[in-house]
Regions:
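Intrinsically disordered, low-complexity coil segments
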Residues: 55-59, 114-117, 136-139, 153-159, ...
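Polybasic (Lys/Arg-rich)
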Residues: 230-277
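Hydrophobic/aromatic-lined pockets within catalytic cores
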Residues: 19-24, 166-169, 196-200, 244, ...
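Helix N-cap / beta->alpha transition motif
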Residues: 96-97, 225, 272
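Mg2+/Mn2+-dependent nuclease catalytic core
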Residues: 123-237
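Alpha-helical structural motif
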Residues: 11, 99-103, 187, 232-239
């Protein structure tokens, strides 16, 4: 039994990459509906792939002794078609369904139109996927961050971390809930702390660009609350102190860390509050 790939995961991955590199929007194509059980249909696909490859400056077509035609063996034609298709994929093309194309076009439209083009303005002059390596001053632990984007005050007036998040949340409230559940404040706080320490610049703004991979396939640009980021920085430094203790004691506990000191890993268990609801009265009438 093989689990099928989930289309929403592919869309999420593509959307994330395309907002980092908008040219990818132009590399998603819907293949023509040609009968692949006939030589004419296979030849039509060969012409289609050749037209795509002809647009690529880095592609050098192989010198051929013979041009594909109906005179070729059918299996040889199909192998030739498959090689061309794979070459397109190697050059960055993705082939998708008509429905998926409509979704991607919606994301593309929102990318360019949202807030009068604010996303492009925020990313003008920004650096993408740059790693920052440093050492925490308090714990002396090595640290590294790799934000999706960052921009500086000379370009946009502030030193900002810019994060992209794809989501299956159907509204902003659900997305905020997911951010808290996944502790995004910790990672965003860590980005600011590490980048500020290494560069000497005060990165104190985080802008998050949300990309929906479910209807209505919308986009939102979110300015993170300073209070939430301060909370995240506190959690980050607290986590570093725990990691330092683990290294010093050469002991990396699991759930036994939840037990009280001296309890030897035995955890006091308590059910959540919602389980304490009173039983509702039930009337069982005797109609005899």
């Amino acid at each position: 039994f093989e689990e099928k790939e989930k289309p929403h995961f592919q869309l999420g991955t593509f959307a994330h990459m395309a907002f980092l590199e908008p040219r990818l929007f132009e590399l998603v194509k819907v293949e023509p509906n040609c009968n692949q059980a006939s030589k004419e249909g296979v030849l039509a696909m060969i012409r289609y792939y050749n037209e795509l490859l002809a647009k690529e400056a880095g592609y050098v077509k192989e010198v051929e002794d013979d041009i594909p035609s109906v005179n070729w063996n059918f299996n040889v034609l199909k192998e030739y078609r498959d090689r061309l298709r794979q070459t397109c994929i190697d050059l960055g093309y993705s082939f998708i369904s008509e429905e998926m194309s409509m979704i991607i076009n919606a994301l593309k439209r929102n990318y360019y139109w949202y807030g009068g083009g604010i996303i492009q303005q925020l990313l003008k002059g920004a650096c993408s996927e740059v790693s920052f390596y440093g050492r925490d001053k308090e714990t002396q632990l090595d640290v590294r961050v790799r934000p999706d984007y960052f921009n500086i005050e000379e370009n946009i007036g502030v030193n900002a971390v810019i994060s992209f998040k794809t989501t299956r949340a159907d509204d902003l409230g659900k997305f905020y809930y997911d951010c808290a559940k996944l502790k995004y404040e910790l990672s965003e706080g860590m980005y600011q702390e590490v980048m500020s320490s290494i560069t000497g610049r005060k990165f104190n703004v985080t802008i998050m660009i949300m990309l929906q991979t479910v209807e209505p396939y919308d986009v939102a640009v979110l300015f993170w609350s300073p209070d939430d980021l301060a909370n995240g920085k506190y959690k980050y430094h607290y986590a570093l102190s725990i990691v330092k203790d683990c290294f010093e004691k050469k002991w990396f506990p699991g759930y036994d860390a939840k037990a009280e000191e001296g309890a030897r890993g035995i955890i006091d268990m308590q059910l959540p509050e919602w389980s304490h609801k009173l039983l509702h009265p039930v009337a069982i009438d005797d109609f005899e």
